[in-house]
Amino acid sequence: MPPAAVMIDTTPDFDFSPAHAAAAASAKGDSGDRTLLLAPPSIASREDRLTSLFSVYDRSSTDLQMLDRLAAGLVSLPAKTYDLILVLTDPDGSRRSEVSPLLSNREIWGKVVPALKAGGTLRSEDGSLGQGNSIEEKEAILAGLVLGDDGYTKPDYAEQEVVPLRFGAKKVNADGSVPLSFGKKAAAAPAPAPAPAPVSKGPAGVGFIDFSDDLDLDAEDDDDVIDEDTLLTEADLKRPIQQPPECAPQPGKKRRACKDCTCGLAERIAAEDKARREKAEKGLATLKLKSEDLSELDFTVQGKTGSCNSCYLGDAFRCADCPYIGLPAFKPGEQVKILNNTAQI
């Protein structure tokens, strides 16, 4: 009888690698939350601290990474894997000063945030992440996190659905023109209300939004014209116009209205100038004298006559036989001689 075959199991009894832990969890059907622990460099030398951590967090669903190695790009994190990322600062915050410079690096946030699941949380062990540190808070917000009561949370953006919008068709006349309505519709007799349509019940827990009433765009209703006379009441019309300070006349200067005057000063000044001009034109109208108001002006000098005793000094020569006829009046003391019936002055 041949000897029975002997099978040797070569798998390790204790394997704490992350790949083995993930495979074991999937084999067991474990769907628990995954946690990432981010530790400062000095915590690697404290074995008791690491042991106490893994006594609290399940090693099969917890990963440990060093912040300095993550900042140097020596390790990478899987995307959308962790439900909780915990920064180890000790419960009393004794390692806070060691962690803060590393969390001020934007490259670390660019690697940590994508590793969070939607709705995942990022916080520190002492609960002071982003509290009183504007640099950490700014970097967390710029990375897309939202500050909450239990640290920073990655928003869970649900899948967006496209909702088609249907607009009501405009009414068109027979000739192809669109009717316009500039007034309110006349009140028509109320039509009997239609019977309400049966409402179909949807699945439990699912809500439906009816946009038919909100988006019922009627072109005729939107074309109503507002009467601008109804915008002001009687009290508004009787209220005095408030004159701006820049329109008030300055000492020693004439009032001048602005180019775009809206307070009424330009119209008031134009009316005053027109009234002043009409008054001046009325006062400077043409003076009309009557016949009794007119008198002949005599420029002759009485008592100073010529040799003919007909013309006075300053008088024109009018006698038909006068040798000086047609000549201007002589000046006082001027001597006139006649030569060949021609006056020699």
From Swiss-Prot:
Record keywords, A-Z: 2Fe-2S, 4Fe-4S, Cytoplasm, Iron, Iron-sulfur, Metal-binding, Mitochondrion
Presence of keyword Iron: yes
Residue interval(s) of motif Cx2C motif 2: 319-322
Residues reported in the UniProt entry to bind [2Fe-2S] cluster: 247, 258, 261, 263
Disulfides per UniProt: none
GO aspect biological process, one term: iron-sulfur cluster assembly
Region: Fe-S binding site A, residue numbers: 247-263
Homology family: Belongs to the anamorsin family.
Matches recorded under HAMAP family: Anamorsin
Name of protein: Fe-S cluster assembly protein DRE2
Organism placement in taxonomy: Eukaryota, Fungi, Dikarya, Ascomycota, Pezizomycotina
